[in-house]
Every structure is written in C-alpha cells, then in structure tokens.
Amino acid sequence: MDIIKTLEDEQLRENKFDFHVGDTVKVDYLIKEGNKERVQVYEGTVIKMQGTGLRRTFTVRRLAYGVGVERTFLINSPRVTNVRLVREGKVRRSKLFYLRHREGKAAKVKEKQKF
C-alpha cells in the first residue's frame, strides 16, 4: 500500500460537497484579520476542478465591477467552511476557460433543466 495515500485518506474531510464544473456556488471562506476571524462569501461559476484526494482544488470565477476575478480553493482546506450550490449549469466541457474571453450574456452558463 502506498504510504502517502494512506496518510491522505486519514485527513480527508467527511462531508463531501456535491457540485460540478459549470455550477454557480457560494463558498464560505474563513479569513483571519489580526486576532479576528470572519467568514467571507465568494459567489461565482466553477470553471475548473483539478487533482484528487487531499490536493483536490476548484476555481471559481465571477465579475466584480466589470473585471473578471478568479479564486482557487482547496476542497479539504479547513478555511473552506461550506460550499452551497446556487444553481446547476449545463456544460459539456471539463474546463470552462472560454468564459474568460466572453462578456455580458455570452459569459453565462445555461441552467440545467430538471424534469
């Protein structure tokens, strides 16, 4: 058995977040400022998921004052307290880097219809 794999399995977080590329999510992120702690909510579209196990990351993109901002989070980070699904997106790609070059309505992802 691989030693690194066994160590990672011990530290994996129990509550898995259920979201995919193209979904719009709200990420609750713990921020320390001096001796204070607060939770900052970051909402955007998941454009990339990468890695496996303990090193799994996802990148969220949003527009802030007309400028595209991307932020990468570790799924198993203790600073990521919660990831809430706002809406499911209908995409056929694993990486949505083409959204970086689009503006306005063209940068939106269609919503997945549930029947």
UniProtKB/Swiss-Prot annotation:
Similarity section: Belongs to the bacterial ribosomal protein bL19 family.
Any one cellular-component term (Gene Ontology): cytosolic large ribosomal subunit
GO biological process, one term: translation
One Gene Ontology molecular-function label: structural constituent of ribosome
Function: This protein is located at the 30S-50S ribosomal subunit interface and may play a role in the structure and function of the aminoacyl-tRNA binding site.
Record has Cytoplasm as a keyword: no
Species, as recorded: Finegoldia magna (strain ATCC 29328 / DSM 20472 / WAL 2508)
Keyword list, A-Z: Ribonucleoprotein, Ribosomal protein
InterPro entries to which the protein is assigned, alphabetical: Ribosomal_bL19 (IPR001857), Ribosomal_bL19_CS (IPR018257), Ribosomal_bL19_sf (IPR038657), Translation_prot_SH3-like_sf (IPR008991)
The organism's place on the tree of life at top rank: Bacteria
Full protein name: Large ribosomal subunit protein bL19
